[in-house]
Regions:
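Short, hinge-like loop/turn segments at secondary-structure boundaries
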Residues: 28-32, 144-145, 183-184
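Gly/Ser-rich, acidic/histidine-flanked active-site/gating loops
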Residues: 1-35, 40, 44, 171
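Structural helix-boundary/capping segments
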Residues: 1-10, 45-52, 82-113, 121, ...
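Short, surface-exposed loop/helix-turn segments at secondary-structure junctions
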Residues: 24, 57-67, 99, 103, ...
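Glycine-rich phosphate/pyrophosphate-binding loop
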Residues: 48-51, 58-81
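Short acidic, glycine/serine/threonine-rich loops at helix termini
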Residues: 23-27, 50, 137-138, 176-179
């Protein structure tokens, strides 16, 4: 913020009343979209297909076609993708569609309205990319909720369809990188990239490399 102030920017605090609902909303809508879009990847029409040698009977009552579908999707999708497909299928199922998916769409509309109101007052929104510094690879794979919470500051941009970019802006005492996030109104990518370039021209964080 100090860098942009030195470049002539005027800083103003804004309110985003529905930002706290971003994680819950995103992780209903995104899995629903994943479940719907990835349903076509069955090994017969699109994408990866399991090896024919793997289609031998395995003691189940499944026919060869169902067995091919199951093994193709089990082998072709990673654990996180499978988790999202299951979440999305559940949220879209009868009895839960209205309670989860439709309600999430209504909240997304409120989040978009928050952004519209904010961009009526400012040209750009600035903030952190994540609440914490980077964690070690694989550190939180056993705790999906902890990983999802790291998306708190970025998912609202995806929900609202606004332009966003992240930039390196510093390091922790232990040398872990810290990210700066800029957001601009829809279709204002040129303004966003210009603001990002101004920051990089005034700093050298993007040129630093960690010691390996």
């Amino acid at each position: 913020i100090a860098t942009y102030t030195s470049l002539g920017a005027t800083i103003k605090n804004i309110e985003m009343p529905h930002a706290d609902y971003g994680i819950a909303t995103y992780y209903i809508i995104a899995p629903c979209e994943a479940s719907s879009n990835l349903a076509r990847y069955d090994g017969a029409h699109y994408g990866y297909r399991t090896d024919h040698a793997e289609l031998v009977e395995d003691g189940t009552d499944e026919g060869p076609l169902v067995r091919m579908y199951r093994r193709t999707r089990s082998e072709g999708f990673g654990a996180e993708v499978q988790r999202r497909i299951m979440l999305g299928t559940y949220a879209l199922s009868e009895g839960y569609y209205d309670a989860f998916y439709l309600k999430a769409l209504k909240v997304r509309r409120l989040i978009r309205q928050d952004y519209d109101n904010a961009f009526g007052e400012v040209d750009m929104i600035i903030g952190p990319v994540t609440a914490n510094a980077a964690f070690s690879k694989g550190e939180k794979t056993s705790d999906p909720m902890a990983m999802y919470l790291e998306d708190l500051y970025t998912v609202t941009a995806n929900l609202a369809g606004v332009a966003g970019i992240s930039l390196p802006c510093g390091f922790t005492k232990s040398g872990l990188p810290i990210g700066l996030q800029l957001q601009a109104a829809p279709f204002q990518e040129e303004k966003l990239l210009r603001a990002a370039q101004m920051f990089q021209n005034a700093t050298d964080f993007h040129t630093r490399r960690p010691e390996l």
